[in-house]
Structure formats: C-alpha cells, structure tokens
C-alpha cells in the first residue's frame, strides 16, 4: 500500500511551520547539549524506512518488461530520484554535524561492481568538511609491522563526521587471502578479531554500515571491456583486476567465509544487487537514509541584503595580471 502524506491547508500550514521551526530549534539545542543521548532517542523513535522514504510512484510501471524481467532504470527517472535522495543526504549530514553522530560506511565487492560510482553519488551534494572518503593503497613496510587495523583506525570519524571506506579492512578476508598476500594464520586471526573489533566500534557510539556490491560475472566482463575501450577510464582496470577475473570461484568462497564470520547483529552485511548501476545507487542511498535517525534541521533560506558599493576602490590595470588563456571564445 502506498503511503499518503497529508498536506495542511494554507492557514494551518503557517501555524504548523512556526511550531515545527520552534520544535527543531529545541531539538538542535538538545542535540548540541547531549549528542549521544539525542542520537539514541532519535533512533528509537525513528519511523520505519518505508514510512520515511519511498520511491516515487512513477517507478512502478518501469521495473519489468513484457517478459517479467527487470529492465535497466531509465536515465530521466534515475536522475529525478537521485536528486530527491541527494537533498535528503544534505539533511542527514546537517543533523549528523549538529548531533555529534559518527558513522562509518564500508563499500566492498568485486572489481567493477559499482562501489566508487555509488560513493561519488553519496558525496556529491555533501559538505566535504564533514564527509571523507578513504581508499587506502598497499600497506607500507612500516604499516605491515603494525596491528592490522591500525592504518584504518587513524582515519576514523570525529563527532559529526561521515566516513566512507572504498574497500576497507576486509581486504584481508578477500584479496589478501585469495592472492596469498597474507598467511592462513593471519586470515584466521582476522576472522576471529574482526567481529570483536566492530562490536567495540558500535559500543563506542559509531554506527557501522557494511555494503557488499554483488555483480554477475557477465556484467563484470561487460564493464571490464567498457573500461578497455574508454581511454578516460582505462586506469580503472589494473593487472590485479585481471588476476581476480581468473579467480572468480576463489573470491566467491572467500566472500562466503567472510560473511559467515563477520555478519554480526551489531554490524550486519547488506548486499546491493549491482548489475544495474543506477538502481544499485538509488537502493544503497535509500537504505543509508533509512538507517540514520536524522530529522530535518536545515536552516531557513537566507535573504541576501543589497550589495555594498565599491567606494573609492580602483581595480589594477588588466595588463599587470596573468590570465588563463581563453581557449573557448
């Protein structure tokens, strides 16, 4: 059943708006005073995802074709829904900033599964001062001597921050395990310690959301070929990607083992069906919004005052400045 949102009459709308504004100011004051308690209370009172966020009705007729199979999401519909969800992401970040909420998002999956594209759509509308993306490379010789989680911990969010890991500590259970970059003993140690590590994060007040982007071998092959044909995207295809392509079954087994040991109630895995990139992005963003108990605290629009005159200021001569050449007159 589709949810219906009642729209008040004009007179009632004015009163409701004033009351809502007063209520939000009170919530903002409470959030700043006690961020942890506010986040906990908001989480317990939050509406269910289906009540707070639901796709537009226009999607109903475009999900399947005449044969009953899912079709690729139409670009115009996708862009319209993405714009709506990105506005909600801005509201979410504003609440996170002022409530002191901390959240870590992990994006895992096979090569070319669409992790980076989804991260890009999440971060596009957000203030970069409160949102960071971490994509760590191969550990240095010094890092190899440290506690395995150490190089990830140093990037963890402070109060009011959103942190997105484009691949994470689960490299040990995946690529390092399959490619032989670590010992079987190190893999087993990771399987045992990772759940406790994540429980510790949750107990400390950090929300941990783990997304696995699932892509079929046929779709991955098509995306690899697309990257080879596009000079601007060819850098995305590395020798390691080609090696993992030949080890599909080994990676599948490693992923199953990883899920078996780390799919804990405090930080479960959420699988994103990613053969359709557009649908995967929308589904992931929708799910993220449903998991953060935010309320709309965004301030009212600001009215710009008249611009002040220049007074006695005189611009310096243009011939004394260096300009970027105008290549597109």
Protein language model features and the residues they cover:
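Conserved nucleotide-sensing/catalytic segment adjacent to the nucleotide-binding pocket
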Residues: 74, 129-191
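Post-Walker A helix-loop "phosphate-sensing" segment adjacent to the P-loop in P-loop NTPases
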Residues: 124-133, 296
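Glycine-rich phosphate-binding P-loop
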Residues: 105-123
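Phosphate-binding beta-loop-alpha motif at adenosine-nucleotide cofactor sites
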Residues: 104-108, 206-219, 239-243, 264-280
């Amino acid at each position: 059943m589709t949810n219906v949102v009642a729209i008040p009459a004009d007179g009632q709308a004015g009163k409701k708006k004033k009351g809502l504004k007063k209520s939000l100011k009170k919530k903002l004051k409470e959030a700043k005073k006690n961020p942890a308690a506010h986040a906990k209370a908001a989480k317990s009172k939050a509406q269910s995802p289906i009540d707070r966020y639901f796709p537009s009705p226009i999607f109903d007729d475009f999900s399947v074709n005449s044969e009953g199979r899912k079709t690729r999401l139409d670009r115009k519909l996708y862009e319209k829904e993405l714009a709506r969800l990105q506005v909600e992401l801005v509201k979410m970040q504003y609440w996170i900033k002022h409530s002191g909420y901390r959240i870590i998002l992990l994006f895992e999956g096979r090569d070319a599964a669409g992790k980076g594209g989804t991260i890009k759509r999440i971060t596009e509308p957000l203030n970069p001062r409160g949102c960071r993306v971490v994509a760590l490379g191969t550990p240095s010789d010094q890092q190899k001597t440290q506690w395995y989680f150490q190089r990830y911990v140093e990037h963890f969010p402070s109060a009011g921050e959103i942190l997105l890991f484009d691949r994470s500590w689960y490299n040990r259970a995946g690529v390092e395990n399959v490619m032989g970059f670590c010992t079987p003993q190190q893999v087993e140690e990771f399987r045992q310690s990772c759940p406790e590590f994540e429980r510790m994060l949750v107990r400390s007040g950090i929300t941990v959301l783990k997304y696995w982007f699932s892509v079929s071998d046929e779709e991955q092959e098509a995306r690899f070929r697309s990257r080879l044909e596009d000079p601007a995207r060819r850098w995305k295809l590395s020798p390691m990607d080609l090696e993992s392509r030949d080890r599909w079954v080994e990676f599948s087994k490693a992923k199953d083992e990883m899920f078996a040991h780390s799919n804990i109630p405090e930080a479960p895995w959420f699988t994103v069906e990613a053969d359709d990139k557009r649908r995967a992005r929308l589904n992931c963003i929708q799910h993220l919004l449903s998991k953060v108990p935010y309320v709309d605290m965004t301030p009212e629009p600001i009215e710009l005052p008249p611009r002040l005159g220049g007074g006695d200021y005189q611009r310096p001569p243009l011939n004394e400045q260096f300009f970027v050449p105008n290549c597109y007159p």
